[in-house]
């Protein structure tokens, strides 16, 4: 039987250096984490701040703490219907594929855009934008051997189990996964 490994969201431990963050997570008894650099690492304000040096420091902290990176939390707005905004968000996600690979992360993870951020856009339009985004991201992930997971949230573009199934069936990529936090359905 497979071993059950318990992890924690890094950003629940506050914004710190990667060394302090992973040490604190390990000291709390966890063996893996969702590391969202822009939410958890004090020196990171944008994905441009995730440098090769920071990735190397993260890998060193992983080795020292014994806390692995289960999810490289790459929070971007994948469902913007505005094409310029959507492409900007896709570029952010694509910039992090080599990071996830270097971290040996279990997967990259993102939510799918709060519908309140684009009140004149229908959920169907937002889901179509999500499909376009994933259609651009997944081929790169497949090429690099990186898994990409989307998280269903009630008030986001991908908001129900049926919407999740539609996305999985439409994209049909072996590298597409789903993060399931049941609290997000209420």
Locate the predicted segments by residue:
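N-terminal pre-domain/capping segments
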Residues: 1-105, 124-125, 135, 173, ...
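Acidic/histidine-rich catalytic cores of soluble enzymes
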Residues: 3-8, 33, 125, 132-186
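Active-site-proximal loop/turn and secondary-structure-junction residues that shape catalytic pockets
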Residues: 12-14, 37-39, 75-78, 112-117, ...
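Alpha-helix N-cap/helix-start motif
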Residues: 18, 119, 157-161
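Active-site groove signature of glycoside hydrolases
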Residues: 100-121, 144-153
């Amino acid at each position: 039987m497979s071993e059950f490994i318990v992890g924690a969201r890094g950003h629940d431990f506050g914004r710190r250096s990667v060394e302090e963050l992973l040490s604190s997570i390990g000291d709390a008894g966890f063996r893996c984490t969702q590391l969202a650099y822009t939410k958890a690492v004090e020196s990171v304000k944008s994905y441009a701040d995730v440098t090769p040096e920071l990735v190397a420091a993260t890998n060193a902290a992983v080795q020292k703490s014994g806390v692995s990176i289960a999810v490289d939390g790459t929070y971007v707005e994948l469902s913007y219907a505005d094409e310029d905004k959507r492409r900007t968000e896709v570029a952010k996600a694509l910039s992090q594929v080599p990071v996830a690979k270097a971290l040996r992360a279990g997967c990259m993870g993102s939510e799918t855009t709060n519908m309140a951020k684009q009140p004149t856009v229908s959920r169907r339009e937002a889901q179509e934008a999500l499909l376009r985004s994933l259609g651009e991201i997944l081929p790169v992930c497949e090429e690099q051997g990186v898994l990409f997971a989307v998280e269903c949230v009630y008030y986001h573009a991908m908001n129900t189990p049926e919407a999740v199934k539609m996305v999985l069936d439409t994209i049909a990529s072996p590298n597409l996964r789903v993060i399931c936090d049941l609290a997000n359905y209420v």
